[in-house]
């Protein structure tokens, strides 16, 4: 039986109800956000391999609060003495996040070893009683690698976070790993290293706190 006028009943088949019609703009907005895609950092309790589409885990703590204190950008060399040349630290609340977008797999593409750059904590961050080391990995293929952080040559896992590799415009991948310390922990060791293993090859970058003062 079809409900009569004034009765609470079902909508006619094939006709969207008023509530659904009102929700269409929200549904379309949600679809646009999902299609665009955002990198979600994953907390790493141990060194592990990550690839495109790897599960993000239960951690939803954003790196915006950790790395939004200053923005990495190319320019004059104004960071600590041990910073890679061509980069500077700019104090900014804007977050530096790699965009992911739609991923395209190219099966016939040759392997490419990642270019690795290790950044020590900035002076602004140390003054705020925080210390974050950043390991940037660019131009690698395929998009699966393993990152291991070391303090004086000993692997460490506490305070490590990793982003999921994202496709670059050249069809290679980029990713970043973060090691969060206190200024006291940063100064108490002779060296910190970021070791990246990719397709049987290993790239390791090391920074010495004593050279950054």
Swiss-Prot record:
Gene Ontology MF terms in the entry: antigen binding
Biological function: Critical for B-cell development.
What disease is this protein tied to? Agammaglobulinemia 2, autosomal recessive: A primary immunodeficiency characterized by profoundly low or absent serum antibodies and low or absent circulating B cells due to an early block of B-cell development. Affected individuals develop severe infections in the first years of life.
Expression sites by tissue: Expressed only in pre-B-cells and a special B-cell line (which is surface Ig negative).
Protein name from the UniProt record = Immunoglobulin lambda-like polypeptide 1
Q: Which CDD domains match?
A: IgC1_L (cd07699)
Disulfide connectivity for this sequence is: 135-194
User: Which locations, inside or outside the cell, does it occupy?
Assistant: Endoplasmic reticulum; Secreted
State the signal peptide span: 1-37
Spell out the InterPro entries in the cross-references. Answer: Ig-like_dom, Ig-like_dom_sf, Ig-like_fold, Ig/MHC_CS, Ig_C1-set, MHC/Immunoglobulin
Q: Which UniProt keywords apply?
A: Disease variant, Disulfide bond, Endoplasmic reticulum, Immunoglobulin domain, Secreted, Signal
Task: List the lineage, top down.
Answer: Eukaryota, Metazoa, Chordata, Craniata, Vertebrata
User: What GO CC annotations are associated with the protein?
Assistant: endoplasmic reticulum; extracellular region; IgG immunoglobulin complex; membrane
For the Ig-like C1-type domain, which residue ranges apply?
114-208
The record's PANTHER family line, in alphabetical order, gives: IG-LIKE DOMAIN-CONTAINING PROTEIN, MHC CLASS II-RELATED
Task: Show the segment(s) annotated as J region.
Answer: 97-108
Record region (C region): 109-213
On assembly, the entry states: Associates non-covalently with VPREB1. Interacts with SYNV1/HRD1 (via N-terminus); this interaction leads to increased IGLL1 ubiquitination and degradation in pre-B cells, possibly through a lysosomal, not proteasomal, pathway.
* Segments forming a coiled coil: none
């Amino acid at each position: 039986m079809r409900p009569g006028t004034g009765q609470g009943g079902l909508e006619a088949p094939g006709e969207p109800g008023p509530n659904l019609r009102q929700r269409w703009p929200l549904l379309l907005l949600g679809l646009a956000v999902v299609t665009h895609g955002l990198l979600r950092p994953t907390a790493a309790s141990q060194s592990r391999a990550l690839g495109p589409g790897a599960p993000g885990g239960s951690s939803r703590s954003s790196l915006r609060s950790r790395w939004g204190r200053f923005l990495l950008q190319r320019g004059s060399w104004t960071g600590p003495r041990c910073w890679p040349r061509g980069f500077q630290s700019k104090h900014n609340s804007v977050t530096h996040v790699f965009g992911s977008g739609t991923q395209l797999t190219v099966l016939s593409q040759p392997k490419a070893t990642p270019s690795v750059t290790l950044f020590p904590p900035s002076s602004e961050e140390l003054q705020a009683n925080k210390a974050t080391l950043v390991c940037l990995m660019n131009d690698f293929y395929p998009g699966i690698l393993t990152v291991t952080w070391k303090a004086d040559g000993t692997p460490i896992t506490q305070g490590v976070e990793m982003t999921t590799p994202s496709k670059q415009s050249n069809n290679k991948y980029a990713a970043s790993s973060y090691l969060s310390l206190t200024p006291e922990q940063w100064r108490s060791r002779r060296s910190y290293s970021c070791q990246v293993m990719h397709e049987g090859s290993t790239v390791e970058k090391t920074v010495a706190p004593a050279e950054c003062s």
